[in-house]
């Protein structure tokens, strides 16, 4: 549960670009809305937003559930600064930390949400911690993108790569391949064992496919300032990105995400 310092540094640097990405592309609000759809309409009280980023999920939650309050947990202070601005005047608490430090704040909530963030956590300690926060009868709702769930991990969403490679060939420049580790997807056995051990019951599971413009993948990659070509002049980079978006125009590919709703039932077994 302890945040990886390197990942935190990456998202610190990306915070403004990530906020712009969330504003430009509706996929993030779709994911958050569909996750919130799983919660009962009568929900009232504090709701934990795990890996809250720039506060989009909490903003949607508070608009839909006027008797809830948001507790945003996010290890990137730069992200939380943006979230504070996005949620100004709303009933929200901001904690710059990982879920591992929840005990320090004696947190209690009627539900927890994790949109596009549960993949960063080990499920066993995560549910152990949530069992101390969520009272019996409370809820945990989270989603996993295709490559973070074993049953969809073979799906691909890399249309951006084809158009980027094409543009770089036109320009006779090398496409900068960003370093990345192949994610280890969560497994059903892992989820079942961790949740049941700490008193959570799986109530529902939904797999969603969102037809998503390839331009979204382009902008996601472009949060890295050395993409698509490392070390090029700003005006060259801008021209390359414009051309990539031209080639991506009108092209869609499915973004697959699986969402889960669990309920806290017992003290664990």
Stretches found by the model and what they are:
Residues 203-252:
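C-terminal helical/coil "lid" or tail adjacent to the Rossmann-like core of SAM-dependent
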């Amino acid at each position: 549960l302890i945040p990886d310092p390197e990942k935190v540094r990456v998202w610190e640097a990306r915070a403004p670009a990530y906020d712009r990405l969330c504003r430009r592309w509706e996929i993030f609000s779709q994911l958050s809305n569909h996750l919130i759809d799983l919660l009962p309409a009568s929900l009232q009280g504090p709701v934990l937003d795990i890996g809250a980023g720039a506060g989009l999920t909490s903003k949607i939650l508070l608009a839909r559930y006027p008797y809830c309050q948001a507790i945003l947990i996010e290890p990137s202070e730069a992200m939380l600064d943006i979230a504070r601005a996005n949620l100004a005047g709303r009933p929200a608490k901001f904690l710059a930390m990982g879920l591992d430090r929840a005990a320090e704040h004696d947190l209690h909530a009627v539900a927890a949400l994790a949109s596009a963030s549960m993949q960063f956590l080990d499920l066993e300690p995560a549910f152990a911690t949530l069992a101390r926060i969520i009272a019996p009868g409370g809820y945990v709702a989270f989603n996993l993108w295709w490559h973070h769930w074993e049953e969809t991990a073979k799906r691909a969403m890399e249309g951006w790569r084809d158009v980027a490679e094409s543009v770089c060939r036109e320009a006779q420049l090398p496409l900068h391949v960003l370093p990345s580790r192949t994610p280890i997807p969560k497994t059903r056995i892992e989820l079942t064992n961790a949740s049941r051990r700490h008193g959570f019951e799986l109530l529902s599971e939904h797999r969603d496919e969102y037809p998503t413009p390839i331009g979204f993948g382009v902008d996601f990659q472009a949060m890295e300032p050395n993409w698509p070509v490392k070390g090029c002049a700003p005006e060259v980079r801008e021209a390359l990105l414009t051309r990539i978006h031209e080639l991506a125009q009108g092209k869609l590919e499915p973004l697959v995400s699986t969402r889960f709703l669990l309920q806290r039932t017992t003290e664990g077994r």
